[in-house]
Swiss-Prot record:
UniProt-listed Enzyme Commission number(s): 4.1.3.24, 4.1.3.25
Temperature dependence: Optimum temperature is 70 degrees Celsius.
Reactions it catalyzes: (S)-malyl-CoA = glyoxylate + acetyl-CoA; (2R,3S)-beta-methylmalyl-CoA = propanoyl-CoA + glyoxylate; (3S)-citramalyl-CoA = pyruvate + acetyl-CoA
Entry's Gene Ontology molecular function annotations: (S)-citramalyl-CoA lyase activity; L-erythro-3-methylmalyl-CoA lyase activity; magnesium ion binding; malyl-CoA lyase activity; metal ion binding
Keywords, ordered alphabetically: Carbon dioxide fixation, Lyase, Magnesium, Manganese, Metal-binding
The keyword Manganese is annotated on this UniProt entry: yes
Source domain of life: Bacteria
Field pH dependence: Optimum pH is 7.1.
One biological process term in Gene Ontology: oxaloacetate metabolic process
Self-association state and partner proteins as the record states: Homohexamer. Dimer of trimers.
Positions contributing to Mg(2+) binding: E157, D184
Gene (name only): mcl
Cofactor binding note: Divalent cations such as magnesium or manganese.
Protein name stated in the entry: Malyl-CoA/beta-methylmalyl-CoA/citramalyl-CoA lyase
Length: 348
């Protein structure tokens, strides 16, 4: 069951901020994760914040159980001490069935709720998970006089979560979007891979036999094509954003870039970075190609109102390609506001 339309945007607690109706317009090409319990990494955060679109403190996977409270406290400490400027601030809390999650949310909202943009919830399986966090956040926001609503980002890591995507997307006006969690999702599905994202050398198609050909070529395929496309469809239909999650082979930058590029072309807004070397990869991939932007601008200039037909370099352009061009140019304009070098290259 969903709320009736006239109740959907009402605050869930007296004194909680009014829910938003549209997501903020801002670049989110790279969501950089950091472990807040590590002091030397916390010390670098003010500098890292200048390089990324989103910083996400990680309290869940990869944080040892005996360091959970230290990670939470470290996150609060670094947030209090840092001016993030126009960089968005997220936190991935522990799973909703864990002994830490209630304190994660309560203590972080109480201490730094007015600086926090998004809470990422791991292993979301259905709208009931979002409803719980939605109500809990509203009560905390009211208690601590938080000025703007904290949004919810759902991490897709189970087959049940994938089945319930539409219901999750429409569960609350707090919904920001989805991220793909390939390792846990692979385990949940029973996929036969130990890789965190990326392809697999045994997953592909074999070319038809050709006369005189000694070997039939084998073409490796993307394990995550269907999942990403489904996630993007549901997110966009609900006005949300879709993100490729982690790519685990930190040293294989070429494979990381290829996986990120597939996600970008399919409609994802951005991807996670787990190490500093993945930051420029994500920023490069999720910024539209300069030549694509320049060509898209020509389409918009030739068809100012999007109607009619134009021929550009021998290619027919119509209202459908005008819409495609507008997507590219709108993204380029948004990124240009944050990146002077790209602004110059795009001519914006």
């Amino acid at each position: 069951m969903r709320k009736l339309a006239h109740n959907f945007y009402k605050p869930l607690a007296i004194g909680a901020p009014e829910p938003i109706r549209e997501l903020p317009v801002r670049p989110e090409r790279v969501v950089h994760f950091f472990p807040p319990h590590v002091e030397k990494i916390r010390a670098r955060i003010p500098e890292v914040a200048k390089q990324v679109d989103v910083l996400c403190g990680n309290l869940e996977d990869a944080i040892p159980m005996d360091a959970k409270e230290a990670a939470r406290n470290g996150f609060i400490e670094v947030v209090k001490a840092t001016d993030f400027g126009d960089t968005a601030l997220w936190v991935r809390v522990n799973a909703l069935n864990s002994p830490w999650v209630l304190d994660d949310i309560a203590e972080i909202v109480a201490a730094v709720g007015n600086k926090l943009d998004v809470i990422m919830i791991p292993k979301v399986e259905g709208p009931w998970d979002i409803h719980f966090v939605d109500q809990y956040l509203a009560l905390l926001e009211a208690r601590h006089q938080i000025k703007k609503p904290i949004l919810i980002h759902a991490l897709l890591e189970t087959a049940q979560g994938m089945v319930n995507l539409e219901e999750i997307a429409g569960a609350s006006p707090r919904m920001h979007g989805f991220s793909l969690g390939p390792a846990d999702l692979a385990a949940s599905r029973g996929m036969k891979t130990t890789r965190v994202g990326g392809g697999h050398p045994f997953y592909g198609v074999l070319a038809d036999p050709q006369e005189g050909q000694a070997e039939r070529p084998f073409y490796q395929q993307d394990l995550w094509h269907y999942t990403i496309a489904r996630m993007v469809d549901v997110a966009v239909a609900h006005g949300l954003r879709a993100f490729y999650g982690p790519f685990g082979d930190i040293k294989d930058e070429a494979a990381c870039e290829a996986q990120f590029r597939n996600a970008f072309l399919l409609g994802c807004t951005g991807a996670w970075s787990l190490a500093p070397n993945q930051i420029p990869i994500a920023k490069r991939v999720f910024s539209p190609d300069v030549n694509e932007v320049l060509f898209a601008k020509r389409i918009l200039e030739a068809m100012p109102d999007g109607s009619g037909v134009a021929m550009i370099d021998g290619k027919m352009q119509d209202d459908a390609t005008w819409k495609q061009a507008k997507v590219i140019v709108d993204l380029a304009r948004m990124i240009a506001k944050k990146d002077p070098d790209l602004a110059q290259a795009y001519g914006l």
